[in-house]
Design a protein with these regions (language model features):
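Start-of-domain marker
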Residues: 18-77, 81-84
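Short loop/turn motifs that connect adjacent beta-strands in outer-membrane beta-barrel proteins
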Residues: 20, 34-37, 71, 110-115, ...
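Outer-membrane beta-barrel transmembrane domain signature
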Residues: 109, 113-200
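Transmembrane beta-strands of outer-membrane beta-barrel proteins
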Residues: 27, 39-45, 73-79, 106, ...
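Residues that define the transmembrane beta-barrel architecture of outer-membrane proteins
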Residues: 22-24, 56-58, 97-101, 131-137, ...
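Outer-membrane beta-barrel "beta-signal"
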Residues: 102-105, 208-235
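Sequence/structural signature of outer-membrane beta-barrel proteins
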Residues: 45-51, 79-90, 123-128, 162-168, ...
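Residues on the lipid-exposed face of transmembrane beta-strands in outer-membrane beta-barrel proteins
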Residues: 28-32, 62-66, 103-109, 122, ...
Length: 235
């Protein structure tokens, strides 16, 4: 746990020293395991353009998942996504107020201690005056450091890359990259700090943004031997 705290402080210092470049990206996600097959998930996110300043975005979402087996998982989710203009903390009027519904398939496979997660998602997105479809694919990789599996008292490194595609120009909408470390303290609490680069493509311009991300994951599972978790966000 001490090593995770040191890494967190170092990454915070790096982000603070580049305050104009780094935003903050905070995530709290929870999972309630109802049975061997069914779970309920929810997630809260808060993002800022500067390091814990100029907050411009939040999202609240949740879903229900069904586990076919340890390697195949289906999820139905919905959420509210709100974006504010730049220049302050939650400056009005809103830039975007979105309601979203999505269907998701997650497939896991293992190569010795290396864990791979393939996530496919189809999104239906409703805005005030428009509707859009979007399709996403994420490859997530995790490697436990001090244990063979990711479980209680385990440090790990993790990275993912995700592409966002639409059915309208410019079609390739976004690329999101993450690299970080994590620590699963016990069977219900995981802490994962890391770096995110999000690059957006539009018809007239393309722009990227750096974030310091901190994720806190809470899983409530009454089973004596809970399944090995693949670290990552609902988003």
């Amino acid at each position: 746990m001490r090593a995770c705290v040191i890494v967190l402080l170092l990454m915070s210092q790096i982000a603070f020293s580049q305050k104009s470049d780094f935003g903050s990206w905070n995530v709290i996600n929870t999972k309630l395991v109802l049975s061997e097959r069914w779970s309920v998930l929810n997630e809260l996110q808060l993002r800022s353009q500067s390091f814990y300043d100029n907050h411009y975005y939040y999202e609240i979402k949740g879903g229900v998942s069904y586990s076919v087996n340890k390697n195949f998982l289906f999820l139905l989710g919905t959420g509210k996504y709100v974006t504010y203009p730049d220049g302050g903390n939650f400056v009005k009027p809103l830039s975007s107020d979105e309601f979203r519904f999505w269907q998701q398939l997650t497939m896991n496979h293992f190569l010795e201690r290396l864990k791979f997660e393939h996530r496919y998602r189809a999104e239906q997105r409703w805005f005030k005056d428009s509707y859009r479809n979007r399709f996403r694919y994420r490859l997530n990789v995790a490697l436990p450091i001090n244990n063979k599996k990711i479980g209680p008292k385990t440090f790990y490194v993790a990275s993912f890359d995700e592409i966002f595609l639409t059915n309208k120009a410019p079609y390739f909408e976004r690329n999101r990259f993450f690299a970080g470390v994590g620590y699963q303290a016990n069977k219900w609490l995981t802490i994962q700090p890391g770096y995110v680069n999000q690059y957006d493509y539009k018809n007239d311009v393309a722009q990227g943004k750096h974030f310091f991300q901190l994720t806190i994951g809470i899983e409530i599972d009454a089973h004596k031997d809970p399944k090995e978790k693949m670290p990552g966000n609902v988003d």
